[in-house]
Amino acid sequence: MRDFPVFTTEYGVASLVLREVPYRQEAYITIQSALQPEELLNECISFCRMVGAEKIFARGHAYVEQYPLHCAILEMRGCVEVEEEKVSNLWPVTKETAGQWRQFLNEKLRPIDNAGTLESKGEQEILDLGGAYFVHRDGQLLGAGWLAGEELKLIASAKPGAGEQVFHSLLSVDSPEQLRLEVASTNERAIRFYERMGLVKTAELRRWYRVH
């Protein structure tokens, strides 16, 4: 399902992210400008519901702040020293294995708030950018992730206790001077993990409110 970067009504302009509707039945509304914010929001909600969204979130205008907070998206940064004893075997994702990598991460991240679903049409871009890996040790899959330059875009472990090995293995490729990532405020387990790894919260990037 395609997104609407510009959704124009007589009440104002918004952008609609609908790509998660087929997977998570979620839609995201960002109000760009509003002459009548209540009416604009209602039109956006109505459209999102019409295409199948059951959970709808919004941001971009003070009007939506009266609704329950769903989550905030936090930025975390830090200088991380790779612990070599925790580095395992890295298998670069290829055209033949991109689907398997994508499916694994989607399954692991589906319960996480604001975690976007990886689609097959985005595989080539990931391959072109590089930095996507499986992490193995002794013939067993420990996890997978995607490190693009200094940004850790995705990471998931295949079993409890493997997170640190996956983390240090991914960072061993380029050893960025300062690592950056984004995490939902509701993902407290991940935040605690990243803090143990040496990262700190540096900014609140945006807030999403549950409007339906």
Spell out what each predicted region is:
Residues 1-8, 110-138:
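Active-site rim helix/loop that mediates acceptor-substrate recognition in acyltransferases
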Residues 31-89, 166, 173, 179-181, ...:
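Acyl-donor-binding surface of acyltransferase catalytic domains
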Residues 122-212:
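Compact recognition or signaling/catalytic modules
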Residues 1-43, 136-160:
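Conserved donor-binding loop and adjoining core beta-sheet/short helix segment
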Residues 5, 12, 65-69, 130-131, ...:
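Short glycine-aromatic motifs
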Residues 43, 100-104, 165, 169:
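Alpha-helical elements of Rossmann-like donor-binding domains used by nucleotide-donor carbohydrate transfer enzymes
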Residues 1, 83-117:
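Short amphipathic alpha-helix that is part of the acyltransferase structural core
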